[in-house]
């Protein structure tokens, strides 16, 4: 906290945070941790994958300047997921700066089963859709890639069955890219073998959650 406050005073940022270092030494949980630190798994967000110190869209946890939070409208308790991103968005919209520093590291223990991982990322997707409804023009490729992947897979299967088997090609390309990426992301042989399934679970669960997110999920 002392380091975060020093950075805040030096940079003038209204929120200072660092890296969510997903880590585990146990089986599937270890593989999931590696996926959550990879760009193929979670995109290029600094607080997941690391990077140099500087302004950021959001940070993990964070040390907030109280007056700035109050000026931005406070913490919105209606959000079940993505609360930190939503608050940081309002802070930035209000003229504040969010600062990432890689020296601030918090160890995170990820889910340890496919079922729990799928449920987690399904909820992430659902609430990301809520964010895009409440704050228009905030969706970027990182957030839209999973639902696009789900739609492409569904269309590929439909066209392959109804028109021509060649339309199954995008699915093969998607899973081939996961397999190739897993070779570089996975640390051990077991990780490399499990990684494609872990990545697909993260991507597709998020995508399905985003697509099926009901408007009534957010109580206005």
Stretch-by-stretch model annotation:
Residues 76-139:
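Catalytic donor/gating beta->alpha subdomain of glycosyltransferases that bind UDP-sugars
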Residues 1-38, 97, 102-109:
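Conserved donor NDP-sugar-binding/catalytic core segment of glycosyltransferases
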Residues 2-3, 30, 86-90, 127, ...:
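Alpha-helical elements of Rossmann-like donor-binding domains used by nucleotide-donor carbohydrate transfer enzymes
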Residues 48-81, 90, 94, 102-103:
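Conserved nucleotide-sugar donor-binding catalytic segment
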Residues 148-219:
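Membrane-embedded multi-pass helical conduit in multi-pass membrane proteins
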Residues 15-25, 32-61, 70, 134, ...:
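Short, flexible, basic/aromatic active-site loop/helix in glycosyltransferases
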Residues 139-147:
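Select subsegments of transmembrane alpha-helices in polytopic membrane proteins
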């Amino acid at each position: 906290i002392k380091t975060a406050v020093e950075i805040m005073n030096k940079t003038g940022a209204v929120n200072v945070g660092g890296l969510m270092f997903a880590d585990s030494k146990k089986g599937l949980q270890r593989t999931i941790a590696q996926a959550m630190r990879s760009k193929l798994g979670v995109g290029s967000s600094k607080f997941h994958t690391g990077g140099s110190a500087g302004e950021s869209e959001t940070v993990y946890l964070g040390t907030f300047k109280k007056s700035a939070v109050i000026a931005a409208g406070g913490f919105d308790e209606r959000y079940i997921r993505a609360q930190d991103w939503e608050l940081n968005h309002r802070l930035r919209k209000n003229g504040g700066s969010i600062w990432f520093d890689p020296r601030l590291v918090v160890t995170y223990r990820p889910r340890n089963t496919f079922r729990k991982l799928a449920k987690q990322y399904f909820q992430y997707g659902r609430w990301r859709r809520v964010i895009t409804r409440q704050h228009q023009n905030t969706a970027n490729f990182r957030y839209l890639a999973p639902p696009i992947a789900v739609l492409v897979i569904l269309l590929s299967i439909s066209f392959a069955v109804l028109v021509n088997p060649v339309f199954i090609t995008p699915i093969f390309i998607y899973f081939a890219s996961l397999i190739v990426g897993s070779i570089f992301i996975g640390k051990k042989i077991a990780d490399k073998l499990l990684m494609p399934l872990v990545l697909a679970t993260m991507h597709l669960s998020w995508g399905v959650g985003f697509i099926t997110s009901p408007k009534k999920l957010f109580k206005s």
